[in-house]
Design a protein with these regions (language model features):
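Catalytic and substrate-binding regions of cell-wall glycan-acting enzymes that process beta-1,4-linked
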Residues: 131-208
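Export/targeting segments at the very N-terminus of extracytoplasmic proteins
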Residues: 22-71, 106-109, 123-127, 215, ...
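Secretory-pathway/luminal and periplasmic proteins that interact with or process carbohydrate-rich
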Residues: 23-29, 69-78, 94, 119-122, ...
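Second-shell loop/turn segments in exported
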Residues: 30-37, 47-50, 72-75, 94-105, ...
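Extended ligand-binding regions for polar small-molecule ligands
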Residues: 1-19, 41, 196-199, 203-210
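Substrate-binding/active-site groove segments that recognize
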Residues: 74-100, 107-118, 176-177, 202
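Low-complexity, Gly/Ser/Thr/Pro-rich intrinsically disordered linker/tail segments
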Residues: 194-247
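Alpha-helical scaffolds flanking conserved acidic
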Residues: 57-63, 82, 130-138
Length: 247
């Protein structure tokens, strides 16, 4: 099992670092709107509506949304990502999401669900659907081709390229010349720590959302700060779909 308890501690530390005056630039919202009622956000009805398109549990979609925007529909990054699910302009164009609609919560979530579905299709060689989720999340953040590079490195080094616990190791190593210059790597450098932490944070929060639904046993402040602003994206072309090297 890739997820281990110590990951939650790492996520907690990362989020505390992010919860600083420098990282706040828009509205901030709690990661759990009403614990007793099992209400995660004001957009739960949209997550439930479009999660089947993504083929995901709606709470996983919610966890990803919080990581992307802290449920701020007007969130934007210096790189141009916009809205609840931080859709990049190039991705919006690919999904036929008009610039005028990118901040509209329903259309933004719908576009993200369609993109997740597309990534799911592109990772069908990962036969375990639960394992596949890790790769989809990583690709959403770091780029599909970078994750394929990490899989190629895992295979070359005798690891299982279809297990995230093995591939994550090489996602992290793709920030070092020894690995991003390897002949099997086609798309070069990536900031692997951001992507690995992104996957860990979403998975951890998803587990919390699943545990807090319709119960009062876990409060929003258990392990996760009540509010914090998502950090800025570091990659300009996180969602690039063309078969060219990412920047």
């Amino acid at each position: 099992n890739w997820y281990k308890p110590e990951i939650a501690a790492n996520v907690k530390r990362e989020e505390r670092e992010l919860f600083s005056i420098q990282s706040i630039h828009r509205h901030v919202y709690a990661p759990m709107l009403n614990t007793q009622a099992g209400i995660i956000s004001n957009y739960d009805h949209l997550f439930k509506r479009y999660a089947p398109i993504a083929r995901w549990d709606w709470r996983l979609l919610a966890a990803q949304c919080y990581q992307e925007s802290c449920f701020d529909p007007k969130a934007y990054s210096w790189a141009g990502a916009k809205g609840l699910m931080q859709i990049m302009p190039e991705t919006a164009k690919h999904l036929r999401l008009a610039e005028s609609d990118v901040y509209e919560p329903e259309l933004n979530i719908y576009a993200a669900a369609r993109y997740i579905n597309e990534l799911n299709t592109r990772f069908m060689d990962i036969r375990n659907p639960e394992e596949r989720k890790f790769f989809i999340l990583a690709s959403y953040n770091g780029g599909f081709f970078h994750i394929r590079d990490a899989m190629a490195l895992a295979k070359k080094n005798g690891k299982n390229p279809y297990k995230w616990i093995h591939v994550a190791e090489y996602v992290l190593k793709l920030s070092t010349p020894e690995y991003y210059n390897d002949p099997v790597v086609k798309y070069g450098y990536m900031r692997g720590s951001e992507t690995a932490n992104y996957v860990s944070a979403i998975y951890s929060r998803w587990q919390k959302y699943r545990g807090t639904r319709n119960t009062a046993t876990i409060t929003p402040t258990d392990d996760i700060p009540t509010i914090y602003e998502p950090h800025k994206a570091s990659k300009k072309h996180r969602f690039k779909l063309k078969n060219v090297k990412d920047n």
